[in-house]
């Protein structure tokens, strides 16, 4: 296990290679990961964003990072944590994670939104509002996985999306769902 004093020495050394290694360590002290979330090097920040041990405060700093790669790594990590969060009993930390996921699902870059969509597509514990928002995205890379796999979309949601979606291929993604009701099937055909 990494001691706090050892992590502090790495931070004080200002050696990028050592900081990258520290940012990737699951046993790094939370304070060190928080400090590294503000590093000038986007690679260091990306490693913190991908680190499951990073404290929620570091994740919140990184949600608005100037680097799309950093936000993408954060989106991937947060979305992968979602299946582990029970739908009923949510703690304050879990609520903050959901807030991060909501923000990343609204990212200006389709690539970041697509990462969120791919990671949560079949997850039943994601808030339904996030799945519905991604399902209505104009980019197929974003809405496609949700339309095809999300268990959170109702028949009414799917029929409305077929009627109003501007994303080419939305109806085809819905048609590829494992189970499609007659009313949804009729909407796809017409």
Say what each PLM segment does.
Residues 1-190:
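Alpha-helical scaffold segments
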């Amino acid at each position: 296990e990494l001691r706090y004093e050892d992590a502090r020495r790495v931070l004080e050394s200002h050696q990028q290679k050592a900081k990258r290694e520290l940012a990737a360590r699951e046993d790094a002290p939370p304070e060190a990961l928080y400090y590294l979330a503000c590093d000038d090097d986007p690679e260091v920040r990306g490693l913190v964003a991908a680190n499951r041990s990073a404290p929620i405060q570091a994740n919140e700093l990184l949600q608005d990072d100037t680097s799309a790669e950093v936000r993408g790594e954060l989106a991937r990590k947060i979305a992968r944590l979602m299946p582990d969060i029970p739908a009923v009993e949510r703690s304050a930390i879990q609520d903050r994670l959901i807030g991060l996921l909501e923000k990343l699902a609204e990212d200006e870059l389709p690539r970041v939104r697509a990462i969120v969509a791919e990671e949560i597509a079949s997850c039943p514990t994601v808030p339904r509002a996030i799945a519905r928002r991604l399902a209505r995205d104009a980019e197929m890379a974003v809405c496609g996985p949700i339309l095809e796999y999300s268990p959170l979309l109702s028949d009414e949601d799917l029929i409305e999306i077929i009627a109003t979606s501007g994303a080419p291929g939305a109806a085809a993604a819905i048609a590829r769902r494992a189970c499609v009701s007659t009313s949804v099937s009729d909407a796809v055909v017409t």
